Structures are given as structure tokens and as C-alpha cells.
Amino acid sequence: LVAGRSRLTPDIPAPEFLSLLETYERIAAISRRLGAYAYLWFSEDTQNQAALNLQGRLDQVLVAAHNRALFFDLWFKGLPDEAAQRLIESSGDERYFLESLRRLRPFTLSEPEERVIALKDANGIDALVNLYDMLTSQYSFALQVEGETKTLTQDELMAYCRHPAPEVRAAAYQELYRVYRANSTVLAQIYNHRVRDWHAEMLELRHFAEPISARNTMNDLPDAVVNTLLEVCRSNAGVFQRYFGLKARWLNLGKLRRYDIYAPLSPSEKRYGLDEAVDLVLASLEDFSREVAGLARRVFDEQHLDATPRPGKRGGAYCYGVLPGLTPWILTNFTGRARDVPTLAHELGHAVHAMMAADHSVLTYNAPLPLAETASVFGEMLLTDLLLGRESDPTVRRELLASVLDDTYATVLRQAYFTLFERDAHRLIDEGKTIEELASHYFAALGEQFGSAVELSDEFRWEWIVVPHFYHTPFYTYAYSFGQLLVLALYQRYRAEGEAFLPRYRKILAYGGSASPAHILAEAGIDIGDPGFWQGGFDVISGLITDLEGLEVPS
């Protein structure tokens, strides 16, 4: 690629340009493969020194490679419009990648400046974020259950936040925040640096209008669309407050505590073995599409699932789609709780999405962030329908529907309020506010979110330092709200149209990252700039609550 630099002129013939673009693509593929190997190894055990050393060395190598190839991006961004459009027209599957480079043109710096930023990230903020992961992954938690004190990982502890016993739920949350609060000075300082780094680069150097505007531009979403989504979510906080009032009556509580919002309605939660969970998820996909189920099976056939919790293992769950043609890798922490089954369905949905887009270049393979949750949330809904279809007991059906609403709250309103907090946090840190002031602001936002429907305990003011997305990917979480409300609309169409819906759904997934979210969804008849579209998702949620209100309260 460097050898061809002298050929990069505004009048370069299209075949020569495409040959250089192909080399650029090969470099990107090798970089992704190496980076993925290091991250997957690190995820197995975040305390593994060999994995840490490899990741650190690779970071340096990949930054150096990125900096050597940086001239290509900058040259293309700097072309006159007519010359750039001529090359875009001949670029085939890479078209949207090149259009995206042009979209970022106003926010791009000179080549020496971009090199400095890449080096700064690798040795600065990226290292700090890795430090956050290392610190939090080694936390252990002590919880007394039935007279026995258990030593737990965070994922194991969180299972007790859905325990049938109110005192166990409360103790689990209190222990979570006790440990994080004890480390809050360090964790909040890391977040402070994350915000200041973002502000320095995105506002002072690149001149985005607002901190969130940088993420919106990367997502190819206008600020106005994201603001509309967030304000519609905010104005519908009462929908979930209504649900929490209903759930309090079901649990025979005068008022729901924040400890109780994910409480099961039954005193004995059903447990699942991993094999049983896999069978259920695959069966739900098979009922929808044999092709989709076949893609999901590849993850298991190729042993690309790491499901067992263990000390040092990265918490949570993710799916890593590395390259077109490679079966994605999935990490979960399966503890046998009912919630772990839809988590598996969710991550398999991501894997299916990646495999559906395998015909694309590595440069246009990954779905844009706003659409990245489409197949994952859709997979959860397919699983719910399967479980409801197999269950005739009205009490169990009610519990399943309540579980859906619990998860919908967690995916829609909770995530929207996370982003609303981030918007404020970036402003407050820029104004020099303290950690305690940030925590107080977060707690006040929780009060707005829950209203008078939920009693808040003081320790929840520290919830924000537990949210890894704030550290890893600022302003990420509205994508969950976007994805869930979008899927509610798509799933309504699937129920109405049956098999006729499949080609349209497949097309959305098969686009990968080869077109803008607005373009992909417009082909499905969806206008993401219309507040009525987002309100329609809340109307579906409200209708589900109405259905539940018509059921008898469990005795």
C-alpha cells in the first residue's frame, strides 16, 4: 500500500484505485484477526499475563500499521467531490465505506495529528479502559444465602438480584455497590479521564457540535433522530412506572423497591442446564427459519462458545464477529438461571446477523451500531414465543410475559436513561464537578425515571461506575433502545405476515454495514425520523401491560 502512495492523485484510474483498496482491505482483515485473537484470549482470563503481554504488544503493532496506512484514508477524505464520487461509483461493495470516509471529512485532522491521536489512544485511554476491565474482573463478592457465605464473581452475584427472597435481592445489590463504592475513587477517576479524553479529541480537535454528536456521526444518524428517540423514551417513563406498580401488587408489596424490579413472581425460579438452553434457542430459531437455525448451529459445531463462569473471566456476554467467512465467537457466563437462556438467544442472534452479512467486504461487514441489536433482540422474542407456545399454565405464562417486560424495561428505558446521563456527565465533568456531584446527579435521574413507583436506596447513586459501556464506548447504549423499539415493529409485521416477512428480514441482516441505517430501514418502510414510529413501540409495550392488568393477581 505504501509503495502505491505516489499513484494516489485525483485522476488515478479506477482499476488502480481498486487494486490499492483491495490491499487496504487485506491489511484491515489481518489486523482484525490478530486483534480478535488477543482479545478472545484476554477474555478467557483477564489476569493471564501472557495474554495481557500479547494484547499490549499487538496494540503497538496494530497502531503502527494503522499509522502507516493512515495516508490512504486522509487522501480519500481530501479529494475534491467530483474525483471522490468518480471512484465511489466504481467501488462496488466498498461504496458505503468510502462514503463514510467522506462523511467524516469535516472532522478529520492532518496525517501527523491523526498519528499522534492513534498513539495517544493506544498508550493512554485504551490502556485506562483495559485497567478498568482488569480491576473489575478480579472483584469478588461475599453473600450469605441460607446461612452459608458464598464467594462469588460479579456474574454469579447478579443472579441473586433476581432471587425470590426480597432480603437476598437487597443483600446482593448492597454487596455489589459495597465493593464498587470501596473502589469508586479509582473507577470514577478512570471515567473522568475517559470523558476528558473524549472532550479533548472530539470537541476541541475534531470540532463536533456535542460529545454525543461524534457517536451519532459514526453511527450515520443525525443528532435530531437520536434526540427524538431519547425524548420519546423519556416522555414514556410513565409506561414502565405503571408496570412497576402492577408488579408491586403481584409481589404483595406496598411499593416496589429498586431491589425488586427484576424479582421473579414465583418463589421457585426454573433452572436450566446449558444443553437444555441450547436446544430451546435452536428450536425457536428452527420454527422461524431453517436457514437461521443452521447458521446458529455453526457456533456450537465449531466450539465457538465459552459459557462457563470462572474467576478472572471477562464478565457479561458478547458475540465477536471477526471476519466474513469466520464463524463468530460467543462468550457468556451461564449460571443456569432463567435469564441466561435469552442471553444465549441474544448473542446467537448477533452471530446469525454476522453470518448473514458474510458476502460483504471486511470494510462493510459489521452492522452499523443502531442496527447491531436487530437480530439479537429478535432472537429473544422468538424464544419467548416458543416458551409461551409450550406453556399452558396461566400462572407460568404470566411470569413469562412479566419477564419480557422486565427485559424490555432493561433494554429500552434503562439504556435511554444511561445515554441521557452520559450527556449530562460529559457536561458536568467539563464544568469541574466532583465525583460526589456526579453520583448525586445520577441518583436524581433515577428519581425521574422511576417516579413515585419505585423506592430508591442510596447505594444506587453508584450504579454508573458499574456500567462498562460508559468506559468502553461512550454514548453506545441508545443503540439498545433503538434496536428494541425497532424489533417491536418488525416482530409485529412478522406475526401479521408469517413467512412472507422472512425475505425482508433477511435483507436487513444481509446488508451488514454496507448502507446507512436510514436507507436499510426505509426499504422496510420505516422512517426513523418520525416520533410516531418510536411512540408506536411504546404503544406495543403499553398494550402488553394492559393485557397483564387483566390477569388475576397471583395469591
Residue spans of the language-model regions?
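Short pre-active-site segment immediately N-terminal to the catalytic Zn-binding motif
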Residues: E269-L274, P324-A345
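A sensor for short, sequence-defined functional sites
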Residues: F72, F76, P80, S90, ...
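A well-structured
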Residues: L1-P267, L551-S555
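Catalytic zinc-binding patch centered on the HExxH motif and its immediate surroundings
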Residues: R206, K270-Y272, D306-T327
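Long, K/E/R/D-enriched contiguous segments that form extended
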Residues: W250-R290, R297, C319, H353, ...
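Helical catalytic core of nucleic-acid polymerases
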Residues: A354-S403
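C-terminal, non-catalytic "cap/extension" segments appended to globular domains
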Residues: S91, F97-L109, M202, D220, ...
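Active-site recognition of the HExxH zinc-binding catalytic motif
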Residues: H207, T335-A357, S376, M381, ...
